[in-house]
Each structure stands twice: as structure tokens, then as C-alpha cells.
Amino acid sequence: IDLPGHSRNIASVHPEIRCNYPPDTVSTNGYDYRSAWCVAREENYALLTDILGELCALFPSEYIHVGGDEVDMTQWNRCPDCQALMSRRGMTDPHRLEDLFMERMAAILAANGKRPGVWNEAVTTGGLSRECLVYGWQSVKACLDATAKGYKTVVMPGEYFYFDMRQTPQEEGHDWAAVFDAKKVFGFDFTEKGFSDEQMRNVVGLQGTFFSEAYVSHEPEKPDYLDYMCFPRICALARIAWRGNCEGWDAYYRELTDHYDRMAAMGIRFRLFPPKVSYKEGAFTVVADDGSEIFYLEGDSPEEHRYTGPVKTEKPHLYRFLTRYKTGRSPYVADKSYYRTLAPAVTITTSMGESTQFPYTNASAYKGLARTRRACRQQDWILYTYEQPV
């Protein structure tokens, strides 16, 4: 549930909830991609009263999270009805429209005996009631701001606690918030981040997050990918949430490896830290410090060979190494020459124009998503030009 933005799905069923202006459908191949509820349309609140009323009856929790993040307020700026509402209320900032919308949501929830949970953007102005429970996801600063304004806050900044983020640059997962492993999770410290004693009184706790759409393409009928992404990061999260990290990483790492047997007994497909790999004088030397066994793969073969000593080769780009311990496994680690072959230099051109927000250099640098300016039509093309044959 996310209001008033992120609502394209319900808008496709109830297009009348959108703002009152003709959308740009040329660049979207005929689709209306507007995703925000019109704040000025009174009928919208009747629909939401019905939806949230049923939701509140289903769930016994004190809080119902109603969202509030990533609202495309340009839609409100273009809507004559929303602009008229702002004028009547003496508003100049569209964030005040979100305040108004969320106040209506809070009233609906209160009528059903519930309190609202919201993302940190919903309290940008500080205008919402302190009855709201804030989930600070955008950054540590967002959590600092919310607690300073007096909001009870669940601290969950993406760069530390979004477990759908990849753990090294070569692994699977998102990377828009950060690339991090359990060591960085353990390194989060409220004092170092600048939380005062007064702000700490507004911290409800820490929370880890994994968004399910990141799971759909990874055999969701099996827990392997979810386990790998969450464990042992979730162990480090629990540790700092309950006891802090004053003893330092080295001491905790020894404690963490004791959890391996527990996780294996529970059938958890956890992630091991990658082994340390060096290639010198024509041979690979590999070390693992957690008692796990080391294996290597050569070329395209899926066969794993047990590492028993230095591996001699004049073709280091063909080798990958990993470790295993019961149900746990590490990511693959390779020589830098291997990654050069996976990320060959390339230039991207197309007939569809380049998005300014997601330029082609994101893709050509292997650092993120790139988009065209419009959808594909007949005779359109995308060309990848490599500096060297691949």
C-alpha cells in the first residue's frame, strides 16, 4: 500500500482518481503513466475510506502503513483542481498537498481504531501529527530529520539495511542505495551518525528490508536467493539493534561464524564472506579464514574442483573461486582480468533518444539502468559498439 503516489495499478482500474489534465502519452507509447491520486478530488476519499476500512478490519495491528514516498508532485502542479485547492488554502509548496492528503488518511485510520505508518518523505514539512510512525528509508539524514521533528521513527536507511542491495559489485541485487555486506551493517552506530539523546528517545528501533519484486526472478518457490541476501546481514542487524557494536568487528566476526552451524541446522542458504584471492608469478593463492572449504571453476565448466594448494596457470581470466560450508556459500571471486572480460568497453547509441535521468553511460559503465527517451516503434534500433571484439 502506498499513497498518494505509486498508485499506477489502481489508476489503471479507476482512472478517475488521477489529476484533471490530459496526460502525455506520446513518449509512453500510448499509456497513461500518471501514478498519483488527485488530492482535490473528494470522491477519492470515499473510495479510500472503503478500501482502508476493509483493510483495517483484516489486520489487528495498531499501525497501518499508508506510504507517502516518491510522489510525482509535478502531476499536482499541472492539475487545475489541485492548484485551485492550494490557492484556497494559501499553500505555495506541493508538499503541503501531501500533508493534506495524509491527514485525511490518518482520519480514516483513526475512525477504524488505527494509527498511520508513513515513509519519511511524508513528514518533510513536519506538518503531520506526531501520531504518525515514520519509517526512515532514504538516508541516515532522513532519520535524523524525522527524530529531530519529534516523530517516532523506525530507522532503516537503505545504505545499511536494504537487503535487496548487492553485497559486492559483481553479485546480484540492486545497487541504487549502496553495495554492502554484513560488515557494513554491523558498522552502523547511532552516536557516530549524530543522534542526540533526545533523538534517540524517538527511535523505535532498527529494521531490515527486502522488497519482494527483487525475488520474483530468482526462483521464488525456493528460499535460496532470499536466504543468501538476508543472512548473515540480518544477524548483524539483530546484534547491533539489541547490543550495539562497541566491541568492534573482529570480535563480532568470531561470534558471527558461530552462527553458521545454527543457520545450517535451520536449512538457511546463507552467504559466506568471499575468500581472499591473489595471483602472482603465474599462480593463484586463496585463503578462507572461517573454516570453509575452497573450490574453483575453470572456464565455462560448471564443475567445482577442491582447492588444495596454489593453482598454476597462465590464463588467470578463466578462473573463479568460492567457498562452501554446509548450507552456506560465498560469491565467486576472480582475478581482475576476469572482470575485464565481463565488462568490455562499449558505446551505446539508439534511434529512440537518451533519457537525461538514466543516460546510456549508466549501462556502458556497468553501473546502473539506462533508458531511452520513448518507447520502441517499428524500425527503431539500439547499437552496442565494442572497442574490441567480444
Annotate each predicted stretch with a short phrase.
Residues 326-334:
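Short, exposed coil/turn segments at beta-strand boundaries within extracellular/luminal domains
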